[in-house]
Amino acid sequence: QSTWGETEEEHQRTRKIAAMRLTFVVALLLVMLTACQAATFYYDFVVAESSYTRLCNTKNMLVVNGQFPGPTITVHKGETFFVNVHNQGSYGITIHWHGVKQPRNPWSDGPENITQCPIQPGTNFTYQVILSNEEGTLWWHAHNDWTRASVHGAIVILPPNNTYHRLTRPTSYQTIILGSWFNADPRTIALQNHAAGTDPDANDANLINGQPGDKYDCSSDSIYTMTVQFGKRYLLRVINAGVNDEQWFGVANHSLTVIGQDGAYVKPFSTNYVMITPGQTMDLLITANQTPGYYYMATSVFSDFNLAPFNNISATAILLYNGTVSRPTSIPFPSLPNATDDAAAASFTSLIKSLDSYGHPFDIPQTVNQEMVITISTNFLNCTSPACINPFAFAASTNNVSFLAQPISILQAYYNNVSGVYTEDFPSNPPESFDYTGDVSALTPYTAQGTRVKTLNYNDRVQIVFQGTNILSAGNHPMHIHGFSFYLVGKGAGNYNSATDPQNFNLANPPLINTFGVPKNGWIALRFVANNPGVWFIHCHIDKHALWGMQTVLIVKNGNTALTSIRAPPTGMPQCSA
């Protein structure tokens, strides 16, 4: 019916105009929605030396944009960002986006001589970082030698439209980066010890947000301080960027609620401490509900290796209630497990389960068609160079293969069908079966080098069991897989039993993670679907073990369509020497 005063012809004209306006508004909203969904961001990273002083020691070290730790990248779930890395240092460098799966985009994954060759001094390269279902805290770091000791920073991935899960909404968040300080240049330490075949000394200090804290000399005036308001809830985004050490972390007199790990939600649980390995991230809620004052947050090293040196002086920071004026003579300190407490580590990790909620569904392979058992060991190699201190060199291996990097990237060789760079014969099982966690004194600790990779077909349902061994020096090894998050379906002490242990696998709510510690003289089992074509690195995130050869490579072949195949390489890829 027409509006009062309108003719029928005028009424029809008004309806047409209204319909056109509505169509325009809907189209505009769709464009805006598409733009929001496809949001893209650009960053510039300038890698250059800056002068820093810690422990009364001043040195020049590589950092990004003059910051240590480096800048935080803040984005939303599903977005893409580009980072143009300008290398103003004196040697080649690469950057890895730890925990970002990079669907079909191994070109921007970053590990040196695996997916790219280094960005040479005076040049630049732009990484395209493609997010998918990651949400929470991840991080970026250099991925060559030990350069990541000073070249690292956080990636904060906010939920779409900042719609936090009702259990996890904080007042605000704070990034807490655990790190390592070396008085000497860490890259030089790594290369000199590697050439000499020796085990490097421990770091000179542990760090929280770039500061050792007041348990170290010359450090009390620069301790990191986080100010809170009574009654408010805060999200601590904790990252272990340490080079070689797993860490305990806690806050005095405050309970921590774990809500996320490695860019995925977990079923919330409360604890007085966390155990976090190099490479891992954890999202922790803390409520400021104690008597206003000063409270230590602190780390200490978890190191159950028989022979490895470590620095067990705690890094400290201060949790300070707003309005507190004077610093007391005594500040509460968190109670943390001792350095070799395997039981405490196992107790903590057993509490981590996935949170099944809207927008975060499970996709756990209930059956598998590719099974691998990979032993991880520390070993020896013959050392014959003039730099050798002993006739043997420290080494490490997976399935008794100590990985040998090549001067050309494996991705470049694979994509361009270059022969002679690697072989596709990495063993799916240990070449020799033995009592892996028992008395191995009759076995040789020596291993052999090789560039041997494992190939998978697109959409293979994969199960990998990492089996620790007692060869040379048993210990907890944090294994990281690039290109995937995996479900940790099982773990245990001793030798994995393929007949009985799968009966106890958690196929209901296992944690979805990208890095996890294989327990000392124990094993872990993980599952994932190989639906990300490319070349993907697997390695221990204790950097000296990775440098020694505790690493290998997965090649996931293309699917049958363009959308299930590796993307074309970007322009400007750093050139390799072969």
Protein language model features and the residues they cover:
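C-terminal helix/juxtamembrane-tail motif
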Residues: 1, 103-105, 205, 562-578
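Cleavable N-terminal signal peptides of Sec/SRP-targeted secreted and luminal proteins
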Residues: 21-38
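Histidine- and aromatic-enriched segments that form or immediately flank copper-ligand environments
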Residues: 41-167, 245-274, 295-311, 385-520, ...
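Low-complexity, Pro/Ser/Thr- and charge-rich linker/hinge segments at domain boundaries
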Residues: 160-174, 324-337, 560-569
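Acidic-aromatic/histidine active-site loop/patch
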Residues: 171-233, 237-242, 352, 370, ...
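A conserved active-site cap/scaffold subdomain adjacent to cofactor or substrate pockets
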Residues: 239, 283-296
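Ligand-binding face of N-terminal immunoglobulin V-set domains in extracellular IgSF glycoproteins
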Residues: 279
